[in-house]
């Protein structure tokens, strides 16, 4: 058993979680983060686990939502990212959203204080040297060009890429609350919430149609060197959605369902723009689903046509950057190791998962796998029935391009979802098969119940009833 540390390149969500898991297992870690020595197009600070896009970890409903289930599994596994998120949550309906600065600060302080973690602020411009016999590359979607080239050369394949976008953030005191109102969709109460966690900006039909046209006509930032790079459907720029059809937005991020105008409850809005709290103080709100590649001056002009935002002061305007990821199913084994170089693992968005939580989850697994090998043990893979296992299986075993479709790129970034889980047997109540919505709900409950039970068993944790009895 070697006493060499595990070297982790990248101090984002995946790298931070990987470092924490390995150190908690008793293995020394060197975490390499290039900021502030070298910055990126999206990062604004040198804090670890900085959230560069949304401040939302999405749904926290572990019974009905796949990402909520992943939250629960990560908490069971002692996730640093989830504990920091829980400690810095801000109201967001049924979602878990966080104060981005407080969250990053909490992660940074925890890692700096851990006796087995050393943080080195430096750029790693190539693949780890041979004497780094256990290493994890968790450089994320904004991997530095020199390292990206080294990865491409080592794998014999060009990195895949897609566009990702950032939504604007607005100062709360510049929002007209005589026009807007506080309400969560369907008054849903989430973690740390009240059922009135979003600011809603209503539009009538004429305002909506004019807004859609303004999005389409607005001047966009050009990225000619990235032509042919696809968008990730879960993070489409608002103007791209507008171009797909005049009704697309009001059935997407601007849907009015479940919302009643507190100032005029008898009149139903044709469309609604929602703003979500971005920091614990409640002084900043981000525009939900409003990722954009509009030029900055155009963003100010167009977004100030939204009722209630006529005098909006923007703390941050939207932007666009390119994400890179590798063809993981062909390059990585089940424990996230590069097949051509044992001991070198990849974690986070660079593996082809999408989302903060998913990236951290893959970092969690990579850290555990590397620590196990350092301790002379075989990595313990999570069951396919868990959210951990379903996501890992998608990354390392899903969507390999077939020989008869050589030109088709089938592996693309994906959020965790119930379609990645093994099916469950048809759920029956009193011997009768369920149908419609009841069937869907029962199926999800069966998947999540099975997942949590199998996750506890994988982690060596007692069942919930046993925990309760032990506490007594």
Swiss-Prot record:
It is found in: Cytoplasm. GO terms for cellular component: cytosol. FAD binds at residues 10-15. Coiled coil: none annotated. Its EC number is 2.1.1.74. Pfam families: GIDA. PROSITE patterns: GIDA_2 (PS01281). It comes from the Bacteria. One of its GO terms (molecular function) is flavin adenine dinucleotide binding. One of its GO terms (biological process) is tRNA wobble uridine modification. Keywords: Cytoplasm, FAD, Flavoprotein, Methyltransferase, NAD, NADP, Transferase, tRNA processing. InterPro entries: FAD/NAD-bd_sf (IPR036188), MnmG-rel (IPR002218), MnmG-rel_CS (IPR020595), MnmG_N (IPR040131), TrmFO (IPR004417). Its main location: cytoplasm. Its cofactor is FAD. It catalyses: uridine(54) in tRNA + (6R)-5,10-methylene-5,6,7,8-tetrahydrofolate + NADH + H(+) = 5-methyluridine(54) in tRNA + (6S)-5,6,7,8-tetrahydrofolate + NAD(+); uridine(54) in tRNA + (6R)-5,10-methylene-5,6,7,8-tetrahydrofolate + NADPH + H(+) = 5-methyluridine(54) in tRNA + (6S)-5,6,7,8-tetrahydrofolate + NADP(+). NCBIfam families: gid_trmFO, PRK05335.1. Catalyzes the folate-dependent formation of 5-methyl-uridine at position 54 (M-5-U54) in all tRNAs. Belongs to the MnmG family. TrmFO subfamily. This is Methylenetetrahydrofolate--tRNA-(uracil-5-)-methyltransferase TrmFO.
């Amino acid at each position: 058993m070697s006493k060499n540390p595990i070297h982790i390149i990248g101090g984002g969500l995946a790298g931070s979680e990987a470092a924490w898991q390995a150190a908690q297992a008793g293995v020394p870690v060197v975490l390499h983060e290039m900021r502030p020595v070298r910055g990126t197009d999206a990062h604004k600070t040198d804090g670890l686990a900085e959230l560069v896009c949304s401040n939302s970890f999405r749904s926290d409903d572990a019974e009905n939502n796949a990402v909520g289930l992943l939250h629960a599994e990560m908490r069971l596994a002692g996730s640093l990212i989830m504990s920091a998120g829980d400690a810095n949550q801000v109201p967001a309906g049924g979602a878990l959203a966080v104060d981005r600065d407080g969250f990053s600060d909490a992660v940074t302080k925890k890692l700096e204080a851990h006796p087995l973690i050393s943080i080195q602020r430096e750029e790693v411009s190539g693949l780890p040297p041979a004497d780094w016999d256990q290493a994890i590359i968790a450089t994320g979607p904004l991997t530095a060009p020199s390292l990206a080239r080294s990865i491409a050369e080592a794998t014999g394949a060009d990195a895949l890429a897609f566009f990702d976008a950032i939504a604007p953030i607005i100062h709360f005191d510049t929002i007209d609350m005589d026009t807007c109102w506080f309400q969560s969709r369907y008054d849903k109460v989430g973690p740390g919430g009240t059922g009135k966690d979003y600011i809603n900006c209503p539009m009538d039909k004429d305002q909506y149609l004019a807004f859609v046209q303004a999005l389409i006509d607005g001047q966009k930032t050009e990225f000619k060197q990235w032509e042919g790079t696809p968008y990730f459907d879960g993070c489409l720029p608002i103007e791209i959605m507008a171009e797909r059809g005049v009704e697309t937005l009001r059935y997407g991020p601007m849907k009015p369902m479940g919302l009643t105008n507190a100032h005029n409850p008898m009149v139903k809005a044709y469309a609604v723009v929602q703003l979500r709290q971005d920091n614990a103080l409640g002084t900043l709100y981000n525009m939900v689903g409003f990722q954009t590649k509009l030029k900055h001056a155009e963003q100010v002009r167009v977004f100030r046509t939204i009722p209630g935002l006529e005098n909006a002061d923007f703390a941050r305007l939207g932007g666009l950057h390119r994400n890179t990821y590798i063809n993981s199913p062909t390059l990585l084994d089940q424990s996230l190791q590069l097949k051509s170089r044992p001991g070198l693992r990849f974690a986070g968005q660079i593996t082809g998962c999408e989302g903060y939580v998913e990236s951290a989850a893959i970092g969690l697994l990579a850290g555990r796998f590397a620590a196990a090998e350092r301790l002379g043990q075989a990595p313990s893979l999570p069951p396919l029935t868990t959210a951990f296992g379903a996501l890992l299986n998608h990354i390392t075993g899903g969507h390999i391009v077939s020989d008869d479709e050589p030109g088709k790129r089938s592996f693309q970034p994906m959020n965790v979802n119930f379609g990645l889980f093994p099916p469950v047997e048809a759920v029956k109540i009193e011997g009768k098969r369920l149908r419609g919505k009841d069937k869907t709900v029962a199926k999800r409950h069966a998947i999540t119940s099975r997942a949590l039970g199998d996750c506890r068993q994988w982690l060596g944790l007692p069942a919930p009833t046993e925990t309760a009895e032990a506490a007594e």
